[in-house]
Amino acid sequence: MSRVCQVTGKRPMSGNNRSHAMNATKRRFLPNLHSHRFWVEGEKRFVTLRVSAKGMRVIDKKGIETVLAEIRARGEKY
């Protein structure tokens, strides 16, 4: 399963670790992803999404029905 938020599209990004001597070594910054079940009142069922913490805030703000419609419009499965 890829490390991508199904709502926001956040994915891992790369950067550097910096030691005290300012030596740079490559590292990855991973999104804060969680598998979360959401109740969809219109479909009378739970939907499991892999979402970031920000994705959960977006769902709280817009509503799960609207977010699922956007995911469907992009052609993704959930």
Curated annotation (Swiss-Prot):
Keywords tagged on the record: Ribonucleoprotein, Ribosomal protein
Entry superkingdom: Bacteria
GO biological process terms on file: translation
Gene3D superfamilies: Ribosomal protein L28/L24
SUPFAM superfamilies from the UniProt entry: L28p-like
GO cellular component, one term: ribonucleoprotein complex
InterPro entries referenced in this protein's UniProt entry, alphabetically: Bacterial_rp_bL28 (IPR050096), Ribosomal_bL28 (IPR026569), Ribosomal_bL28/bL31-like_sf (IPR034704), Ribosomal_bL28_bact-type (IPR001383), Ribosomal_bL28_sf (IPR037147)
Pfam family, one: Ribosomal_L28
Annotated region (Disordered), positions in chain: 1-22
Record's keyword annotation contains Ribosomal protein: yes
Example of a GO MF term: structural constituent of ribosome
Transmembrane segments: none
HAMAP family named among the record's database cross-references: Ribosomal_bL28 (MF_00373)
Similarity annotation: Belongs to the bacterial ribosomal protein bL28 family.
PANTHER family: 50S RIBOSOMAL PROTEIN L28, LARGE RIBOSOMAL SUBUNIT PROTEIN BL28A
Protein name: Large ribosomal subunit protein bL28
Native species: Yersinia pestis (strain Pestoides F)
